[in-house]
Amino acid sequence: MKRLALALKQKKVASWKLEEVKELTELIKNSNTILIGSLEGFPADKLHEIRKKLRGKAIIKVTKNTLFKIAAKNAGINTEKLEQYLTGPNVFIFTKDNPFLTNMFFENYKLRRYAMPGDKAEEEVIIPAGDTGMPAGPILSVFGKLKVQTKVQDGKVHVVKDTVVAKPGDVIPTEALPILQKLGIMPVYVKLKIKVAYHEGLVIPAENLKLNLEGYRSNIAEAYRNAFTLAVEIAYPVPDVLKFTISKVFKNAIALASEIGYLTPESAQAVISKAVAKAYALATAISGKVDLGVQLPAAQQTQTQQSTAEEKKEEKKEEEKKGPSEEEIGSGLASLFG
């Protein structure tokens, strides 16, 4: 037994494993980010498409989990938190890029494969019209089961019109599988499932790698609108805000001049219009009690009444409208503008 144990100890490690560990160690040392993806259920032949797409941005390696673990330790990484992810067939992605952006690539990059029994359609599966290249024979009955109209021309089966054989969510009919393969139709999407990312000492599980860009855009846009509204309200002195602030101040000044009857070239029209409206309103109110010696046009009376009503509405709005308190403005400035 002692001799057997000694022989096992002296057994040499395969040279390819040593080379693999050496290469992996260098890759780990030269990468800011390492992603571990599961190859379970993922067609191995599709990896070359991903390699092609990420050429110059990332290096993709399929290796044994034990070899990666040894290399990681050699590179000074504590693999304790990665242990749970080093199971089953894995692929390792080495990159200098941000882990979130790299994961986004894998989230959005879908590959196609041929359908297998039990697969569900993610989109309409269509057998297109035209020459199938298939010789007439038993295959015609299969087309019949799928309710695909066909005709035989020059000994070949031709599909008369585009036909949907599966809708989104439907299981793709087993009868359709050989036809889809012969026609080169790959209706099933597959994507590499990322398990975890290791970035500069941080272990980031897959669920924490997903970015909700639309949500972020919406939040930023809302924050900008709120900040801009506040900035206009307090006349914060920056170019983008001042042009709106000046416009608002000008309108308020004209409204005030109109109310107190202050005449300037800019306010004259508003002041006179308001004075005329008030005069007609007063004349209308007393015309039934006092003979004014003039006939008020009916249309003008209606217009005056409408103007008076609108003025009351505007006054009510102004009364209801309350600006932010000094404390609110102070806290808003502190949070928005440092």
Curated annotation (Swiss-Prot):
One of its GO terms (biological process) is ribosomal large subunit assembly. Keywords: Ribonucleoprotein, Ribosomal protein, RNA-binding, rRNA-binding. It comes from the Archaea. GO terms for cellular component: cytosolic large ribosomal subunit. GO terms for molecular function: large ribosomal subunit rRNA binding; structural constituent of ribosome. Transmembrane segments: none annotated. Residues 298-338 are annotated as: Disordered. Residues 298-308 have a biased composition (Low complexity). Residues 309-325 have a biased composition (Basic and acidic residues). InterPro entries: Ribosomal_protein_uL10, Ribosomal_uL10, Ribosomal_uL10-like_insert, Ribosomal_uL10-like_insert_sf, Ribosomal_uL10-like_sf, Ribosomal_uL10_arc. Part of the 50S ribosomal subunit. Forms part of the ribosomal stalk which helps the ribosome interact with GTP-bound translation factors. Forms a heptameric L10(L12)2(L12)2(L12)2 complex, where L10 forms an elongated spine to which the L12 dimers bind in a sequential fashion. Forms part of the ribosomal stalk, playing a central role in the interaction of the ribosome with GTP-bound translation factors. Belongs to the universal ribosomal protein uL10 family. PANTHER family: 60S ACIDIC RIBOSOMAL PROTEIN P0, LARGE RIBOSOMAL SUBUNIT PROTEIN UL10. This is Large ribosomal subunit protein uL10.
